[in-house]
Amino acid sequence: MLDNVDVKIPQHEKGNLAENSLGGTELLSMELFRRLSQEYKDKFQFIVSRVNDIEENKRRIYWLHDLALDPVHSLLTTPSIDLFDKLVFVSHWQQQQFNTLLKIPYERGEVIKNAIVPIPKHQKSETKDLQLVYASTPQRGLDVLMASLDLIDRTDFHLHVFSSYSLYGWKQNDEPYKHLFEKCESDPRVTYYGAVPYDEMRNHWKNMHILAYPS
């Protein structure tokens, strides 16, 4: 899927843990860098999620996408926090967690919420069934969702599952969830897609009614 990427982002640099990833953080980064003028790319180093290297001749913005207690943030509890001119959080809750758990002063950061390119107005395909969608990695509650299907006192629904670590280039991480994916494939109430390109995912979204996210 990386073959069609038309913009350079920090995560896709060689050696980065996310160098083969096209998850939500990478999609956000790609949209930012498409819109950002070269002037700002020259003046600032944008560090996304993990610190791989430091560019000494630039001001540094650290865009945080993970939980406060993720080990990658340990350097924020040391004088190394002064390496960064500004921290950017994706929600006020996340910033609060960094303040509560890591004692990061609020004035060190700004909140810029996650976003997507809006899906154009459209007509959903006519169907008698409610279309449910799960679109995330499997550890975020897919097992709970699959078990809950038998507790729903109705049959007029169909679940669409988009879930695989291959989206991040970590196909081997799917192995512990192989039985869960097989369960999805064998259930007539479910269609399992694995990981698909983002544009294909957006087309599917047009016909969905409910986001099923049980975690």
Model-derived regions, located:
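N-terminal pre-catalytic "stem/leader" segment of glycosyltransferase-like enzymes
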Residues: M1-I54
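Active-site proximal beta-strand in glycosyltransferases
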Residues: F44-P71, D85-F89, E110-I112
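Conserved donor-binding/catalytic core segment of Leloir-type glycosyltransferases
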Residues: K124-G141, M146-L149, L159-H160
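Acidic donor-binding loop of glycosyltransferase active sites
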Residues: K206-S215
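Nucleotide-activated donor-binding/catalytic signature segment of Leloir-type glycosyltransferases, i.e.
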Residues: D174-D199
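Donor nucleotide-sugar binding/catalytic pocket of nucleotide-sugar-dependent glycosyltransferases
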Residues: D85-N99, I104-K121
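Membrane-proximal helix-turn-helix segments that form the acceptor-binding/catalytic region
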Residues: L67-L87, H179-K183
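Glycosyltransferase donor-sugar binding loop
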Residues: H158-P176, G194
